[in-house]
């Protein structure tokens, strides 16, 4: 398998081709961590869909939760007060009007389900929102462990706990997302995180959909676990790994289900060196190496047109020209999400 490298704007693009099955359908994704600006107003749909439509043809947009301030971590409790029954990161009353507006413009929509942090709606003894509702499993209250007593020599100063200090101040720590709005994560072994995506899909009735588990859920969470309980036409997910640079060659995706989803995607959480993007068996890792006809993306999925382009990168960050140039390179080479070719960007 030949792996040509293209240099563009200080970045390297890895292209791994395989058979085509569907016509190209680029996707524009509304960022799930949008700042509290006009990303969710209907006026944005009216004013900007014409900018995207000529550039990307039959664009498909994903919707996203209500705005959350980046300095406040996950969605704060007052944000979810509009509809506790349907809100889960994002809620139906926010999502459906946007989708209807896009449908009125002839634009297809995918619901973007991002499992990030659980909303901590209960305070601990310090007055910090870091206790989860009982229905999500045991509450995570920081500090989790008391300081161990040690025999100290006379005059030896007592050591303090770094975790306790950072949690008390509201800064980022194991169970805190900053600004005193801590939202401890739930482990992937719990049944609630694995059951949430299909429940959200059924309640909003918006197939197809995409689920992106937070890395802290662990590698036990798989797309097949969600797909087995849904009937959507397209199901994608991510298989997260750890570490800043994966030094070892990536391995194939574990075959944890006898009936895999119709369309899946795997992507590492951190960067993989270009020369290591080939498994021990000589094939590409993950879903592409295992079942190419069922894969929709490979390594990365934003700002490459494969298949997502982030809304905030395109409009808010002023990267419209750079992203369009990158997409034009892919279009000239006939590289599209449905063509099954992958694109991986790393700084040169």
UniProtKB/Swiss-Prot annotation:
Q: Give the Low complexity compositional bias ranges.
A: 161-188, 223-266
| Cofactors, names only | Ca(2+)
- Recite the UniProt cofactor note for this protein: Binds 3 Ca(2+) ions per subunit.
Compositionally skewed regions (Polar residues) per UniProt: 189-207
Q: What Enzyme Commission number(s) apply to this enzyme?
A: 3.2.1.1
Give the signal peptide, or none: none
Q: Classify the source by domain of life.
A: Eukaryota
Question: Which residues are involved in binding substrate?
Answer: 87-88, 182-187, 214, 283, 289-291, 302, 344
Keyword annotations for this protein, in alphabetical order, are: Calcium, Carbohydrate metabolism, Glycosidase, Hydrolase, Metal-binding
Q: Which tissues does the record link to its expression? A: In callus, weakly expressed.
Q: Has UniProt tagged this entry with the keyword NADP?
A: no
GO biological processes:
sucrose catabolic process
Instruction: Please state what class of enzyme this protein is.
Output: hydrolase
Please list the reactions this protein catalyses.
Answer: Endohydrolysis of (1->4)-alpha-D-glucosidic linkages in polysaccharides containing three or more (1->4)-alpha-linked D-glucose units
Q: Does the keyword Hydrolase apply?
A: yes
Composition-biased stretches (Basic residues): 145-160
Q: Where is this region: Disordered?
A: 126-266
Q: Which residues bind Ca(2+)?
A: 116, 188
Purpose? Important for breakdown of endosperm starch during germination.
Subunit notes for this chain? Monomer.
Family that this chain belongs to: Belongs to the glycosyl hydrolase 13 family.
| Entry protein name | Alpha-amylase isozyme C
Q: Which organism is it from?
A: Oryza sativa subsp. japonica (Rice)
């Amino acid at each position: 398998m030949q792996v040509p490298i293209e240099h563009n704007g200080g970045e390297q693009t890895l292209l791994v081709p395989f058979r085509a099955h569907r016509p190209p359908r680029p996707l524009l994704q509304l960022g799930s961590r949008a700042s509290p600006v006009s990303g969710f107003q209907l006026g944005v749909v009216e004013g900007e869909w014409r900018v995207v439509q000529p550039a990307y043809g039959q664009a498909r947009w994903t919707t996203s939760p209500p705005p959350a301030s980046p300095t406040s971590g996950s969605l704060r409790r007052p944000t979810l007060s509009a509809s506790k029954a349907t809100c889960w990161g994002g809620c139906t009353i926010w999502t459906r009007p946007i989708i209807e507006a896009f449908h009125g413009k002839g634009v297809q929509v995918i619901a973007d389900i991002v499992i990030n942090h659980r909303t901590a709606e209960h305070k601990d003894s310090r007055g910090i929102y870091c206790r989860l509702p009982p229905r999500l499993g045991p509450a995570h209250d920081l500090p989790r462990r008391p300081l161990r007593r040690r025999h100290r020599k006379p005059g030896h100063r007592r050591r303090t706990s770094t975790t306790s200090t950072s949690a008390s101040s509201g800064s980022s720590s194991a169970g805190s997302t900053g600004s005193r709005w801590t939202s401890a994560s739930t482990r992937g072994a719990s049944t609630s995180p694995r059951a949430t995506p299909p429940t959200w899909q059924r309640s909003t009735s918006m197939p197809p959909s995409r689920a992106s588990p937070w890395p802290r859920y662990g590698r036990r969470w798989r797309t097949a676990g969600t797909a087995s309980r849904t009937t959507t036409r397209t199901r994608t997910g991510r298989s997260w790994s750890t570490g800043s640079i994966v030094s070892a060659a990536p391995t194939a995706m574990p075959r944890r289900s006898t009936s895999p989803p119709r369309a899946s995607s795997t992507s590492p959480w951190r960067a993989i060196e270009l020369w290591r993007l080939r498994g021990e068996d000589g094939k590409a890792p993950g879903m592409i190496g295992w079942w190419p006809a069922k894969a929709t993306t490979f390594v990365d999925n934003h700002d490459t047109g494969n298949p997502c382009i982030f809304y905030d990168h395109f409009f808010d960050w002023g990267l419209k020209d750079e992203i369009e140039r990158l997409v034009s390179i892919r279009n000239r080479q006939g590289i599209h999400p449905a063509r099954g070719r992958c694109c991986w960007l790393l700084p040169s």
